[in-house]
């Protein structure tokens, strides 16, 4: 049986609530209900009673000479009951080493509604590719993740908070039509610090 998220799952409801989802303190929302998010650090609206968020945490941790930039792997967070505006907080970590330990298993995100109530969720670490650049082509990885679990979405369930005509015109119709340079730039922006270092090292080795 398919697990349906989004508008299709709410045919029995006459009132669809558009919930605002706000990432906090270094949380990036990369995809929402299968749709790529243009501004990962900005609030967005989701027109559905449930949401699947692909998120990543990035922040400078530590102090002084021990300060380092930490980038987590992407995690798939599922919220089954999205009945109010929410804020998504990262786990409380204060050093690079602590963050490594926290995100190595099941990080403790905190999702809080405007009512002050803590919202329940489930999560899985997104499975990447083997070897170099494990999260290159993230859209395909998410599609595979959802296909394996029988998860489907209705079209148009996600709206950016602000969408301008210029942005709609400039955005490529499909990733497949983008040339290799655009795809590399797209991957580089989403890559973690360690992935970027590995990519730069690989580039030097090719020269």
From Swiss-Prot:
Keywords from the named record: Signal
Cleavable signal peptide: 1-18
InterPro entries in alphabetical order: UPF0319
Pfam family, one: DUF2057
Record flagged with keyword Signal: yes
Protein family according to the UniProt entry: Belongs to the UPF0319 family.
Name assigned to this protein: UPF0319 protein VV1_2115
